[in-house]
Amino acid sequence: MTTYLTRDGVEITPVIFGTSCLGNLYRVLPYETKLEIVRAWFRAAAKPTIDSAGKYGAGLALESIGRTLRDLAVPSDGITVSVKLGWRRKPLTTPEPTFEPGVWAGLEYDAEQDISYHGIMRCYEEAVELLGGARGIDLVSVHDPDEFLAGGGTVDDILGAYRALFELKKAGRVRGVGIGAKDWHVIRGLYNDIKFDWVMFACAPTILRHPRELREFMHKLEANRVGIIDSALFNGGFLTGGSMLDYRKADPVRDAKLFQKRADYLAVCKDFSVDPAAAAVEFGFRQPGVVAVSLNTSDPARIPMNASYAQHHAPAEFWAELIRRKVIDDEN
């Protein structure tokens, strides 16, 4: 099962497999486990779509992808690869990496941000090299431009980076150019100057957060045939019972309304015997213009289940009850 992401007809799977775990996210993952994760992608989809980044493990995720695909003899056209660009390797001179302390385990390199016309070209060439040289990249984007701007980066540097990416597309080296960000307002602002092929939203829309203003922007993207990938879904795991909320520890006082909303959501799921994770994914697909979702797991056994969520359909009464209890807004 595939779907079209871009106006140019780039096909992807409706469930995209995230790869941050291959960069040793939070813990060192043995190579055999990484190999089994990649095997599971191909059991779940004839031609899987994956999402990675030079930032993941300071390039370790990309290296792991290249190595596993070679070991499994996957042809270069047997997988669709999306890479978020904007971070490059540098020597590790401190006890742990400086770019995200405490997040990555067992790394041999540090990473630094490099977003500009020439910087993004350097990031692209390094990504190709880490993947093994012979394997191309299908989809590219600038990694977290919202954080770049918040840290003092300039819009001009982002525009320069996208000029480089669209030159790569014109030269036939990539097939689509997009954007991914946690702050959707930044995506909307940049869309005034850059006509992306696709966008990825990383913190909304979700069951817990789906502002009307965002939905209006998504309708605009849909009308312009810009494919949307929803990688928020679980709010960092909080929605389904986790302690992390969108990249931070949830606070019962500060986030009291979200704790209550989660409790109501899980209660309705229990009443209707609906899997909370599956319904969260289905909610993503119910949003305007969403053609795919991105899911990440370090457990190979969960990959077939994640892939199956694309076919999940909860009863209409379930969604009506969520609206009645004001867990979600009326979509009409």
Task: Tell what function each PLM region has.
Residues 113-136:
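An active-site-proximal structural segment forming one wall of the substrate-binding cleft
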Residues 1-84, 89-91:
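N-terminal binding-site loop/beta-alpha segment at the start of enzyme catalytic domains
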Residues 20-32, 105-121, 151-152:
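Active-site mouth loops of central-metabolism enzymes
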Residues 12, 47-50, 78-79, 137, ...:
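Local beta-strand N-terminus motif with an aromatic residue
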Residues 33, 125, 129, 138, ...:
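Beta/alpha (TIM)-barrel catalytic core signal, keyed to glycine-rich beta->alpha loops juxtaposed to Asp/Glu
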Residues 7-9, 43, 69-76, 129-135, ...:
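Acidic (Asp/Glu)-rich catalytic clusters
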Residues 79, 83-96, 232-240:
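Short, solvent-exposed beta-strand-terminating loops
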Residues 92-103, 243-247:
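Short, flexible, mixed-charge acidic loops at enzyme active sites
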